[in-house]
């Protein structure tokens, strides 16, 4: 029969460390528009000169909430299973699309699989099982962690809470063509990074395996197996000019190829109660693996 299913899930930033929202930008109770600290004067709606020498009211912003999106994950599946005499066939197609809560980060995966198993020959002594699977994955702007400019969580939690991150949604300064950001010469506007500091990896993966088994008697059988796992990955990284990360920008492209082949055989003898209440199992086999 045919089975169709789908699922949708939504993600959000659920837990986050507490932050003080009493004091504004600066240190030692003094407002400093270029400071990265939030120990300036108490936030009371007073008018101050911001980093761009503009008058604004000193207030608190929840930049974590304002910057990160609602992530959506959609999975769709179609499968087919049918018995044809002594042969069973199964096929499936699964598609996953993930739009992350991190702006600019996306992931998709397509998975196709076909499997068939059968028994044949006199007294069904022969049995065959074969499977082929193909997986295509595509990731854009994989999130990074640690102390680096591409970790947007670090940027949001270290940014003074009296600065509004949405002010920098227009990531390119139209006057200069460079990144628009409050820190001159350091740091990364996360909106700019999502569009102009990108990475992508695309992987094509093939998995194939099969086994052939023969039953000599009800207690003796032999089986051979073969399998292969191979994938080809293309990685692309783009950094546009106009940020402190690079004056002229940079581009990189790389390919990775991997495969592993396995071949094995095994002879198994299993007998219950061949000496009174005693039984036993004996196996003999070998495996050869090739990896590159």
Predicted region positions:
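A beta-strand signature from Gram-negative outer-membrane beta-barrel systems
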Residues: 1-5, 73-75, 94-99
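Outer-membrane beta-barrel channels and translocator barrels
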Residues: 73, 84-85, 121-123, 215-217, ...
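Alpha-helical support elements that line or immediately flank enzyme active sites
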Residues: 208-214, 228
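Outer-membrane beta-barrel initiation region
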Residues: 17, 36-38, 66-70, 80-84, ...
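Surface-exposed loop/interface segments of Gram-negative outer-membrane beta-barrel transport/assembly proteins
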Residues: 3-58, 102-105, 111, 115-205, ...
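Periplasmic N-terminal accessory/gating domains of Gram-negative outer-membrane beta-barrel systems
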Residues: 1, 60-67, 71
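Short, charged beta->alpha transition segments
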Residues: 76-79, 178
């Amino acid at each position: 029969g045919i089975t169709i299913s789908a699922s949708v899930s939504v993600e959000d930033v659920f837990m986050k460390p507490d932050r003080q929202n009493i004091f504004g930008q600066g240190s030692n109770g003094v407002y400093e528009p270029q400071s990265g600290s939030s120990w300036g004067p108490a936030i009371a709606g007073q008018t101050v000169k911001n980093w761009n020498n503009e008058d604004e009211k000193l207030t608190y912003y929840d930049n974590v909430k304002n910057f990160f999106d609602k992530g959506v994950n959609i999975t769709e599946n179609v499968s087919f299973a049918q018995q044809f005499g002594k042969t069973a066939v199964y096929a499936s197609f699964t598609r996953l699309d993930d739009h992350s809560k991190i702006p600019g980060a996306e992931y998709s995966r397509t998975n196709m699989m076909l499997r068939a198993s059968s028994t044949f020959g006199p007294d069904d002594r022969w049995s065959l099982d074969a499977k082929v699977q193909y997986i295509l994955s595509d990731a854009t702007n994989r999130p990074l962690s640690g102390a680096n400019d591409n970790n947007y969580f670090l940027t949001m939690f270290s940014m003074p809470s009296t600065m509004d991150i949405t002010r920098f949604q227009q990531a390119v300064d139209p006057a200069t063509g460079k990144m628009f950001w409050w820190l001159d010469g350091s740091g990364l506007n996360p909106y700019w990074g999502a569009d102009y500091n990108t990475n992508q990896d695309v992987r094509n993966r093939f998995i194939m395996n099969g086994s052939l088994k023969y039953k000599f008697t009800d207690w003796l059988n032999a089986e051979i197996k073969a399998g292969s796992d191979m994938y080809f990955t293309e990685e692309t990284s783009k950094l546009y000019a106009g940020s402190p990360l690079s004056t002229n920008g940079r581009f990189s492209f790389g390919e990775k190829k991997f495969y592993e082949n396995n071949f094995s055989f095994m002879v198994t003898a299993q007998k219950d109660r061949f000496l009174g209440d005693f039984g036993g199992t004996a196996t003999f086999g070998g495996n050869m693996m090739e990896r590159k």
